[in-house]
């Protein structure tokens, strides 16, 4: 399922790939623990791979013709090969939940919240589970038509710049309940 911008596509498979965990690979060097991510990152234009439960999210550096990349074929071939999706070494030296919570809270307070405050918004860290980050947006960010762009291009990039091995970054915001969004969502 491609994103509206065409730079991200989610592939759901019929089995858990990483139950109760996630792994993010922003380049081939980071993908040494995942033969599948390494192969996907070797495809021209592929910028990152996120593996979580039964979904692979592949991001390109620009809008691409997803069917032409044949990523589904690569995934199917790998699933039948018997090779691990992500080796155990990926999870061996992840930062602790406490360290992640401290670092991300500090980042939100120091950089992210001052930036979104100009639009009347704020972002709060709700929880860390393993290496997954749960946030909530409020004020002008809640229900804002640009909230997804803010999350993906601002918040996510800042968090991954600080802690590259963070897994999923999940927005728990009830955007439909936003009372004063900075930009009205398009219908």
What spans do the regions from the language model cover?
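Domain-level signature for proteins that mediate thiol-based redox and metal-cofactor handling
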Residues: 1-187
């Amino acid at each position: 399922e491609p994103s509206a911008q065409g730079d991200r596509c989610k592939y759901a498979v019929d089995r858990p790939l990483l139950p109760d965990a996630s792994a993010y690979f922003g380049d081939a060097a980071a993908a040494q623990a995942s033969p599948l991510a390494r192969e996907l990152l070797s495809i021209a234009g592929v910028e990152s791979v996120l593996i979580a439960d039964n979904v692979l999210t592949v991001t390109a550096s620009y809008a691409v013709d997803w069917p032409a990349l044949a990523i589904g074929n690569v995934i199917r071939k790998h699933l039948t090969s018997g090779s691990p999706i992500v080796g155990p070494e990926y999870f061996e030296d992840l930062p602790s939940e406490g360290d992640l919570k401290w670092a991300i809270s500090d980042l939100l307070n120091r950089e992210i919240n001052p930036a979104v405050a100009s639009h009347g918004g704020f972002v709060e860290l709700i929880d860390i589970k393993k290496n997954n980050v749960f946030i909530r947006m409020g004020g002008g960010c809640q229900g804002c038509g640009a909230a997804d762009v803010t999350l993906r291009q601002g918040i996510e990039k800042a968090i991954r710049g600080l802690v590259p091995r963070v897994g999923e970054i999940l927005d728990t915001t009830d955007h439909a309940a936003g009372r004063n969004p900075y930009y009205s969502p398009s219908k």
